[in-house]
């Protein structure tokens, strides 16, 4: 078998992400989830406005982690970080666990996968787990030869062999196997995963092509997770460190479900570069509590992407602002499982004044952006196109949609078959910015003739409510975890991922898109799918990308906005001066 393309180990990369799915993020920036940060500037906070990166932006201008040689940093110390919601389901491969906070917290202890991303989103072998990745064609089918690092083991001592690759495939290959997965991604196109020359090699044969191939085994799961009950429910309030592998592991009694703290320490079973830090402690906090904690020197970093947080923390001595654009898209998430009438969803899309909501979001921040129009591409991507339906921001056009669908006005609101046109917007946390958006949105919809109720919840309930689809409308969105939109397009717009909501026509377009080998052609096809889906089904809409402003202790190194680059927790540490 002659390989057409080979990726071979040449240098050690410390961490990996899962690139086959995109994680839920709240409507405001995560409190300390640097896994989702991008573009950055230096120095303390200033009033100079930052403009969102657009077409032609230079990648080197879009990140700053205060990069320092690890040999120049202190050995030891503790890093204290806030999180809006930790758990309750620590299996972040499930729908109920797939939140940015969970992904960020668990990334310290769970890094098994073949790939890392560089700043610009290019793939690099994660040599802690993968030695080589070669693909070729045999009998007109794509085959991938994988070689694993024989040093790699899960924390319970289970070696990471071809059996782990088989288990990963078995779990993700179908949405119909009982696993509560987010998306099947590349795995449903795999025909077989077989043992290669030894236990640390495997031959993967595809039933039909899928691109990019580098999304294969971006995650490697412990064979024990093939137990459906364990996969779906076994990680609720139980991180199970024995099933993961990474440079850190859960400390003794490291998950305190009462205090809502998640503490990790260096993993003595880790075979590669040892971490600098002695401990990382994540604490679940509401926004107001996090602001107070940062001012009182109880945490070392805080997201400052809302005006209230930014105003409170921007001038604290010994800190600096690292700022940029989030790898995030969204802000108008209408749950089609609850808001079932497509006409009502379309009217909400068309009647929403996105500019007014974005103005509230960014008021008081030194940041400005053009309203984005894509869930799958960032505006600085060469593939970016505005997919949001037109016309929009129009009360009259929204009313026409309702009336064409059989709604009639009765007082302030439309109704149909005796049922008022309305639903609830769920709001998390106590940040005034989010509450202001909800109140403005409610008035916008009243102008259209749709009644919106505000459903208030704590930040800590975010994962449970959204993971269980227990909401009508949310200001949340998703991470834009890679520059390639293939997996995101399938996750968002394939009907099987949305309980059948969609169309056979769009599903066929997605199936055809995954067969396109040329990256540009495939990603442009993703745009056409997104435009069609938004226009017809209207349940994932864009209001902002937004900044990722993070206030940090000045002497914190190798931590901050890093664009697409995989997080290297081993290199995070404290400078000597």
Model regions and ranges:
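N-terminal export leaders
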Residues: 20-25
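Surface-exposed binding/hinge segments that line
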Residues: 74, 181-230
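Gly/Pro-rich hinge or "lid" segments in bacterial periplasmic/extracellular proteins
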Residues: 100, 108, 119-120, 218-275, ...
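Ligand-site clamp/hinge motif
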Residues: 266-312, 451, 458-459
